[in-house]
Each structure stands twice: as C-alpha cells, then as structure tokens.
Amino acid sequence: MTSNFSQPALQLCYENTNGSCIKTPYSPGPRVILYMVFGFGAVLAVCGNLLVVISVLHFKQLHSPANFLIASLASADFLVGISVMPFSMVRSIESCWYFGDAFCSLHSCCDVAFCYSSALHLCFISVDRYIAVTDPLVYPTKFTVSVSGICISISWILPLVYSSAVFYTGISAKGIESLVSALNCVGGCQIVVNQDWVLIDFLLFFIPTLVMIILYSKIFLVAKQQAVKIETSVSDNRGESSSESHKARVAKRERKAAKTLGVTVVAFMVSWLPYTIDSLVDAFVGFITPAYVYEICCWSAYYNSAMNPLIYAFFYPWFRKAIKLILSGEILKSHSSTMSLFSE
C-alpha cells in the first residue's frame, strides 16, 4: 500500500553534487521583499558613503584631520556595501553560497576586517572629539594631519592582519575540527571559530566601545559646562570682543560635531550589540542559534554601514550642501573645490 501523502522534495544547493548543503528557500513574496530590503541597504551604504568620501576629498574647506578620519570610516563602510553585503544578501535569502570556497574565505575576511576597521575609526574619532572639546586651544597642535594618518593606518592594518590570521591560518578552528567538518558542505559559507577567538572578537568590540562610552560621557559633561560658561559670559558682557565671539562659535561648532558623532557611536553600538552577544553565546552552547536569528543580527550590523551618511545628512548642513553640489554637477566646474560649505 502506498501513501497518498508525499513528503516535499528536499532541495539542495547543488543538485548533482555529493555533500551539497540543504537549501531552504523563501517563498516568492518574502523573497522579493528581502531582496529589496537588503539591496536597498547595500545601495545606500555604497552611494551614501561614496558621497561622504567625495565631499571630504574634493572640498578644501573640509580638509581637516577629523574629516579625514570620517572619510576613511566612510571608505570602510563603502567597502562593506560593495564587497560584503551583496554576496551576503544572496547567501541569506537563497540559504546557499554560490561563489566558491576561495571567495568564501575572502568574503569572510573582508567582512570582519572592514567592520572592525569601522569600530577602530569610531574609537579614534572619539579621541579626536575629546581633545577638540576639552582642550580646544591646543587641539590643532595635538591632532594634526600626521596624527590622523597614523590613526587611519592603525584602523586599517590591525583589522586586516587579524582577519587574515583568523581565516587563512586555520588557528581559529583549532579544537573544533570535528564540528567544522560536520558543518562543512558544498554551497555553505559559515563562520565557525573556537571559544578563544570568539572571546577575542568580543574584546575587539567591547574595548573600543568602552573607550567611546567613557570619552563621550566626559565630552558631554565638559560641553555642558562650556555652554553654561558661554551663556554667563555673554549675559555679563554684551560688548564682547570679536575674538571672544569667534571662540564661542568655534566651541559651539565643536560641541555640535561631538554630539553628531556621539549619535554615530550609539548607532554603531545598537547595530552591533545583538550580533556580538549572539556570537559570544553561540560559541559556548554549540552553535544552536536559529538561522533566522543569526541573519537578523548579521544584517543589523551590516545596516550600520548605511546609517552613518544618513546621520551626517540629518545633522550636518555642510554635508547636505555638498551633496547638492555633487549631484547637480557643480563640482565639475573650475574652483568648485574652494566653495564655502559653512554658513558662518
């Protein structure tokens, strides 16, 4: 006797290949929606951060150590958008990796390197803002272009060296070879590292984040004190000199920049905290996190690369003006690099 009910056919990533991963595709409706959502994030990360880089490099008024750091941060986020997110999008939605083992390693390496590079950039930007707000008179001599260059170099070299060591030496899988072998299949690209390296990953997130929290806490305390002093001084002396007025405007601008970048730091922490906690816990409970939970955490982190340009556009009038000049083609005109972007 045969049953009238048949099990749905098992789908594989590669139908005619032994050891293929099992494919668990979405139905057409959710599939289209996910491609639109993830694709929009990738396009926003690429286009938005490219506008930031062009703005800082083209307009001479933006050539400052702090803005060079911001441009370098935007470069890291741009690379996440163009080299990581599109391929992760296909993997997340199709539940298969179709780009080969070699590119899987490269993709994972770039994923980790560029994301940790963003964290280090934000950490150095916090240091820059701390000096600018707490010691504005000596800031130009302390945080020079050469110092900014050193910070940028560290923010790129350390993550690249670390991620290369993790994915190309095999040391991250030491002690869990049997688990890696069990999870390995054709059409898969899953990052599995041992508990020691998961702890290192957590520290690479936690230490810069802790530094940022401490520095921005001090920044906002100092900024509040400065605001009170300036209000008192203006009310006591209506006829203040132009020099004092200029100092007050500069201090106000530095505080506003610190607040804006503080929002950027908060966005980074909110975006990355779920993924970091999930990775830490998962390594100690046998990697049992459901696929959909992992994907939510992962894309929450990816979307951080698309958020920074939106934050700049919302808080920085100069960035909005730069975008208009770029999109209208005004930057193609001669002497466009010397245009004024600030209202004062």
Curated annotation (Swiss-Prot):
GO terms for molecular function: trace-amine receptor activity. Its main location: membrane. Keywords: Cell membrane, Disulfide bond, G-protein coupled receptor, Glycoprotein, Membrane, Receptor, Transducer, Transmembrane, Transmembrane helix. Residues 53-67, 133-146, 217-260, 304-344 are cytoplasmic. Disulfide bonds join 21-185, 104-189. The keyword Protein transport does not apply. It is a multi-pass membrane protein. InterPro entries: GPCR_Rhodpsn, GPCR_Rhodpsn_7TM, TAAR, TAAR_fam. Disruption phenotype: Mice lacking Taar2, Taar3, Taar4, Taar5, Taar6, Taar7a, Taar7b, Taar7d, Taar7e, Taar7f, Taar8a, Taar8b, Taar8c and Taar9 show no visible phenotype or behavioral deficits. They however show an absence of aversion to low concentrations of amines such as 2-phenylethylamine, isopentylamine, N-methylpiperidine and cadaverine. One of its GO terms (cellular component) is plasma membrane. Specifically expressed in neurons of the olfactory epithelium. The chain crosses the membrane at residues 32-52, 68-88, 112-132, 147-167, 196-216, 261-281, 283-303. Glycans are attached at residues 4, 18. Residues 1-31, 89-111, 168-195, 282 are extracellular. It is found in: Cell membrane. Olfactory receptor specific for trace amines. Trace amine compounds are enriched in animal body fluids and act on trace amine-associated receptors (TAARs) to elicit both intraspecific and interspecific innate behaviors. Ligand-binding causes a conformation change that triggers signaling via G alpha proteins, possibly G(i)/G(o) G alpha proteins. Belongs to the G-protein coupled receptor 1 family. This is Trace amine-associated receptor 8b. It comes from Mus musculus (Mouse).
